[in-house]
Swiss-Prot record:
InterPro entries: PH-like_dom_sf, PH_domain, Rab-GAP-TBC_dom, Rab-GAP_TBC_sf, Rab_GAP_TBC_domain. 'Armus' means hinge, linker in Latin and ancient Greek. It comes from Homo sapiens (Human). Expressed in a broad range of tissues, especially in kidney, liver, lung and placenta. Also expressed in keratinocytes and epithelia-containing organs. Isoform 2 is differentially expressed in prostate normal and cancer cells (at protein level). This is TBC1 domain family member 2A. SMART domains: PH, TBC. Acts as a GTPase-activating protein for RAB7A. Signal effector acting as a linker between RAC1 and RAB7A, leading to RAB7A inactivation and subsequent inhibition of cadherin degradation and reduced cell-cell adhesion. The keyword DNA-binding does not apply. The modification Phosphoserine is found at S436, S915, S920. Residues 45-142 form the PH domain. GO terms for biological process: positive regulation of GTPase activity. GO terms for cellular component: anchoring junction; cell junction; cytoplasm; cytoplasmic vesicle; cytosol; nucleoplasm; plasma membrane.
């Protein structure tokens, strides 16, 4: 038991030289023996232990059973056994996650320990003992939760020097507890070491649930009894003739008695010449491994009467123990008979010579089982009929009892009426009618009854006050424990996120290394290339295997992100699959590393922002990105800021009704583009999703809203992004209106896409200014960037960037306008400039430009490039460049129109000439 392990050093310290005394015992002087009990008990520190009644059992044998409880400080476990002398505990109660409760209306001394798995009902001898146990259990639980962890083998072990601070905090916590419930004094004789000297519990306290432990404890006690009896029957002549006082006996402690269920290695060795009283003390010491110092508390100078009383008590205890042993022997005998019967059946089965005989035995047993089953069914039916009959009889008895009670009440009422009338008649005879009788006895009875009620109410009030104080302290302490556990959990989650981010970084570097090796080797070495292909395949499949084998992973890379986009793009080419996995790992790593350092302060700033007002602070916050929980609200405000002069109530519903009345010319093209909208998003590919229907209605409503544009390819992606964030059709519709009609130039989505072409030329000039080396490299290989960047501007990167970065771009785009698109377009090329410069072939550059935007995973780095490295970037310069290139483009378009008109005129003149020539020939043929 745990108590033995804890008490061992204390006992040895309180009795120095115990080992020498055990080897060569000497008789102590009489003056030292007189105070031996007091000194031994004072030297022992207070331990939380004692006898409590535990309510348990099943069915008709449920009831209170006395158990010995003791607390283990290292494990925060409350162990209990049948007696204090048992070597092995019956069971334990985990107090680390338990709460305590006491009912004011319950029987005195009853309280409960509630754990997540069960509720244990206990009863103390007195109310004071109950409050003492509750308060001590609260303190032990708080000490366990507030205790510092074991010092690690790292430099952090220096934190172990904060012991005084922890003691100070513990003192403060105890002081706070005292404000709720006053400290309860230790009940004498009911709690602690002294409680173990009480008599053993009765026989009915044997635990049938823990029969194995009971057998072990009984065998241990039997061995102790044999040793005690052998010591007690020594010849009396061996007693010390020099002194009539018993010799003080000490013994070395068990080496490991703290472990429940483990017996001590060395049994205690008695002194050579003990008296009868010392023999009894030695027996108690051997039986009680948890408290090896009980025998130190026995008073030395006893009279003959006290010795006789001790012997009688020992005889009584042995008699009770003998009864319990007989009961145990009966139980074991029944178990042995069952085992022998099973053995006989097995022997008969094995002794059968042929399979037929064995089959006949099996059939015989089956028939017996069937017969027994039928008998059980018959008995069950009989039991049910008897139970039904008994219930009917019980109902009849209850009805008769109610009838009898009613008759008795009537009789009692009639007797009271008769008594009152008799008293009244007597009073009328004894007192004249003009004199009012005085009834002091009745007044006294009323006063006493009222006083008794008041006393009862005072007792109830005191009980409820005590319960309230205890529950307040319990709630206060549980709340503090919960906060402390929450802080620990938060710290562990932060540490796990950091470790997972580092793991993602290492894995991405590993995959990148495999990719480079694969590119470097090529087809030179078939064995090496085959090995690399296997490693790449294992790396690509490792995520799914790990997710299936480890069900408690903190935050695995999900297939879809929070907006439904695929986190790892599904490419067909093996190299692109590996690149997509690397990009997903890097993105996950940057996200995890930025959770605490960046995202948490950003969320706090957004939470404290309050009402949205255009300002420089809001501009910086939008550039940093809007947290997901605030993004719908912020986008609605930004859209309303753009379209408040266009917005009219009921406009969207009116447009929908107009579309239902007649079909729009662009409806067919819209229907074709619905299936091509974000094939990498589950909300638009799932057959049961409502997003495609919402998108169809939004695009049709916009076609009726803006007839000059109607519908243009690319609007479906803009509306889809708005739907994913805002989720409401009308909000997404007005977001599309804000982008097309207020943010983008007027002819951005017209038939000629004039403004879009102008922006491509402006981007070329800005790239030449900001990234001249890159533009020279692209010009050397004749790479036309507009083939890649045209779609960026048309759909605001909707098909290019991963969703985490894309939505940050949109946050700033909805507030600042198209300038943000130019900034991020330049930043994307700056981000990948080194990779592009390494490529020395135009075809390789085009292949890389197809997916290089998906390799961007560090959103913070990209944002820093866009809004810091690309400065200065003035809107005035952007307008001037747009104006210059618009004039050039319009001149080119006019020239093209003129050339087109000249060509059409020449072709028409040719057709006329050809038609005239053909007619003359026909006429000639007709004349002929």
């Amino acid at each position: 038991m745990e108590g033995a392990g804890e008490n061992a050093p204390e006992s040895s310290s309180s009795a120095p030289g115990s080992e020498e005394s055990a080897r060569d015992p000497q008789v102590p002087p009489p003056e030292e023996e007189s105070g031996d009990c007091a000194r031994s008990l004072e030297a022992v520190p207070k331990k939380l232990c004692g006898y409590l009644s535990k309510f348990g059992g099943k069915g008709p044998i449920r009831g209170w059973k006395s158990r010995w409880f003791f607390y283990d400080e290292r494990k925060c476990q409350l162990y209990y056994s049948r007696t204090a002398q048992d070597a092995n505990p019956l069971d334990s109660i985990d107090l680390s996650s338990a709460v305590f409760d006491c009912k004011a209306d319950a029987e005195e001394g009853i309280f409960e320990i509630k754990t997540p798995s069960r509720v244990i009902t206990l009863k103390a001898a007195t109310k004071q003992a109950m409050l003492y146990w509750l308060q001590q259990l609260q303190m032990k639980r708080w000490e366990f939760h507030n205790s510092p962890p074991a010092p690690p083998a790292t430099p952090d072990a220096a934190l172990a020097g904060n012991g005084p601070v922890l003691h100070l905090e513990l003192g403060q916590e105890e002081a706070e507890l005292e404000e709720f419930l006053c400290p309860v004094k230790t009940p004498p004789g009911l709690v602690g070491v002294a409680a173990a000297l009480q008599p053993f519990p009765a026989l009915q306290n044997i635990s049938l649930k823990h029969l194995g432990t009971e057998i072990q404890n009984t065998m241990h006690n039997i061995r102790g009894n044999k040793q005690a009896q052998g010591t007690g029957h020594e010849p009396p002549g061996e007693d010390s003739p020099q002194s009539g006082e018993p010799q003080r006996e000490e013994q070395p402690l068990a080496s490991d008695a703290s472990t429940p269920g483990r017996e001590p290695e060395d049994s205690p060795k008695p002194a050579p010449k003990p008296s009868l009283t010392i023999s009894f003390a030695q027996k108690a010491k051997r039986q009680n491994n948890t408290f090896p110092f009980f025998s130190e508390g026995i008073t030395r100078n006893r009279t003959a009467q006290e010795k006789v009383a001790a012997l009688e008590q020992q005889v009584l205890m042995l008699t009770k123990e003998l009864k319990s042993q007989k009961e145990l022997v009966k139980i074991l005998h029944k178990a042995l008979e069952a085992a022998q019967q099973e053995k006989r059946a097995s022997s008969a089965y094995l002794a059968a010579a042929e399979d037929k005989d064995r089959l006949e035995l099996v059939r015989h047993k089956v028939r017996q089982i069937a017969e027994l089953g039928r008998r059980v069914e018959a008995l069950e039916q009989e039991r049910e009929s008897l139970a039904h009959t008994a219930s009917l009889r019980e109902q009849q008895v209850q009805e008769l009892q109610q009838h009898v009670q009613l008759l008795m009440d009537k009789n009692h009422a009639k007797q009271q009426v008769i008594c009152k009338l008799s008293e009244k008649v007597t009073q009328d005879f004894t007192h004249p009618p003009d004199q009012s009788p005085l009834r002091p006895d009745a007044a006294n009875r009323d006063f006493l009854s009222q006083q008794g009620k008041i006393e009862h109410l005072k007792d109830d009030m005191e009980a409820y006050r005590t319960q309230n104080c205890f529950l307040n302290s319990e709630i206060h302490q549980v709340t503090k424990i919960w906060r402390k556990v929450a802080e620990k959990e938060k710290a562990l989650l932060t540490k796990c996120a950091y470790l997972q981010a580092r793991n993602c970084q290492v894995e991405s570097k590993y995959l990148a290394g495999l990719r480079r090796l694969q590119e470097a080797l090529g087809d030179e070495a078939s064995e090496c290339s085959e090995l690399l292909r296997q490693l790449v395949q294992e790396a690509l499949q490792w995520e799914a295997g790990e997710a299936s084998s480890d069900s408690i992973e903190l935050s695995p890379i999900s297939k879809y992100d929070e907006y439904g986009f695929l986190t790892v793009p599904d490419y067909e080419v093996e190299d692109l699959k590996l690149l997509a996995k690397i990009q997903a790992l890097e993105s996950r790593s940057h996200h995890l590393l930025g959770l605490e350092a960046v995202d948490r302060p950003l969320r706090e700033r957004w939470a404290a922002l309050g009402d949205l007002v255009p300002s420089a602070e809001l501009k910086q916050l939008l550039r940093a990105g809007v947290p997901r929980e605030h993004r719908p609200r912020v986008w609605r405000w930004l859209v309303h800021l753009r379209v408040q002069h266009l917005h009219t109530p009921g406009c969207y519903q009116e447009l929908l009704s107009r579309g239902q009345a007649r079909e729009h010319p662009a409806a067919r093209q819209i229907e074709l583009d619905l299936n091509r909208t974000f094939p990498n998003n589950k909300h638009f590919t799932c057959p049961t999703s409502s997003f495609p229907d919402k998108l169809r209605r939004v695009l049709l409503a916009f076609s009726w809203q803006n007839p000059t544009i109607g519908y243009c390819q690319g609007l479906n992606r803009l509306a889809a992004i708005a739907l994913l964030v805002l989720e409401e059709e009308e909000s997404a519709f007005w977001c599309l209106v804000a982008i097309v009609e207020t943010i983008m130039p007027a002819d951005y989505y017209c038939n000629t896409l004039t403004a879009s072409q102008v922006d491509q030329r402006v981007l070329q000039d800005l790239l030449s200014e900001k990234l001249p080396r890159l533009m020279a490299h692209l010009g050397q290989h004749h790479v036309d960037l507009s083939l890649v960047t045209f779609n960026w501007f048309l759909v605001v990167f909707a098909d290019s960037l991963i969703s985490n970065i894309l939505l940050r771009v949109w946050d700033a785009f909805l507030y600042e306008g198209t300038k943000v698109v130019f900034r991020y377009a330049l930043a994307i090329f700056k981000y990948n400039e080194k990779e592009i410069l390494r490529l020395q072939n135009g075809l390789e550059i085009y292949q890389y430009l197809r997916f290089f935007t998906k390799t961007i995973s560090n959103s913070r780095k990209l944002m820093n490039i866009a809004f810091n490295d690309m400065n200065p970037f003035r809107m005035k310069q952007l307008r001037q460049l747009r104006m210059v290139h618009r004039e050039r483009l319009e001149a080119e378009l006019r020239e093209l129109e003129q050339l087109k008109a000249e060509y059409l005129e020449r072709r028409a003149s040719r057709r006329r000439a050809v038609s005239e020539g053909c007619a003359s020939e026909d006429e000639v043929e007709g004349e002929a």
